[in-house]
């Protein structure tokens, strides 16, 4: 048989038994957390019309989206993001619902990663969207919920980097850069590529004094005192509003008791271009990339016909699992509660006993034709916790302590 029959496409992965159990456990923990925080779960189709994500202002890079066609030749897209479908629902199916809307989801997304990246093409994302609330308190709630999500999942060491898109935009206004130039600067700032940034600002003929201050942007990283440093760099009103907003969010997060998790990073500017205010990402030393990200996207809902402020975050379950593995967690395949030897002669007695135990919440795995020795071996090798068999019409259970069938 060809080896290719056993291969899966690049960027995809299988999830085996033990990890699958752990994933479902985490998903249920998050569902409970989101629900108890007032968020209602939605599901959106894996296929949407491509135009849903092809917005000229807030859309996705065409090269990152999986596309196909329906029978009428219309272009479809495999969902690369969960925020835009949630906004679509809020602006259509939920148009009559009063604000604020609190929506959550746990579902897959798929997108081509950047060239040379080892990222998965398909991943499961859990997240929340809080629409209709503009205050810094709403932003703080979303960030606190992201932190609580990582805690609930069992991640021990992580931090949240907090930034503000408006601070970067204000600086770009002051520099007088075009949108194309701004995007190039954004990439250099995000990558902390100081040399490339310096050379590019010189190429764009940015005035020396402004360029000197811009060069400090990637270095605005640390505790709350960074905000005072930032305010000393510019008098731009947009920048000042951004730093004030972050101070308000930090104050609220202190009341949540989560201030210790937060670092300020004003050089963080997400590639996803629908963010309009505060942005954040969750990182851990166990991974080379963020496992969650989010922020405020007040301009996005209006593009779909319902103008309203909005904020939210998405957490990659796949990256969370990788982080748990890196911190030493293992996912052994779950052992059966009971292995029950079954033959045709004792089938009725075996089925009645198994059904009773299952009603009691005990897992029963039927083993057809297994001998008593084979059943005992399954227990001794960890494949099952206990063993049972049918003898003379009665179910007998193996006692490991007494080495006998009872």
Task: Name each model-derived stretch.
Residues 19-37, 48-49, 83-96, 102-155, ...:
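Positively charged, Gly/Ser-enriched RNA/tRNA-binding surfaces
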Residues 1-84, 140, 161:
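TRNA-binding/sensing appendages of the translation machinery
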Residues 153-157, 165-168, 181, 195:
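Extended alpha-helical scaffolds
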Residues 46-62, 163-173, 268-276, 373-377:
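Beta-rich nucleic-acid/ligand-interaction surfaces
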Residues 64-70, 177-199, 206, 258:
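Acidic, His- and aromatic-enriched active-site or binding-groove loops in soluble protein domains
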Residues 145-152, 166-176:
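Hydrophobic mid-domain F-helix/FG-region of cytochrome P450s
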Residues 157-167, 185, 263-267:
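Short, surface-exposed recognition loops or helix-turn segments adjacent to catalytic cores
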Residues 54-68, 179-183, 203, 282-285, ...:
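Short, structured secondary-structure boundary patches
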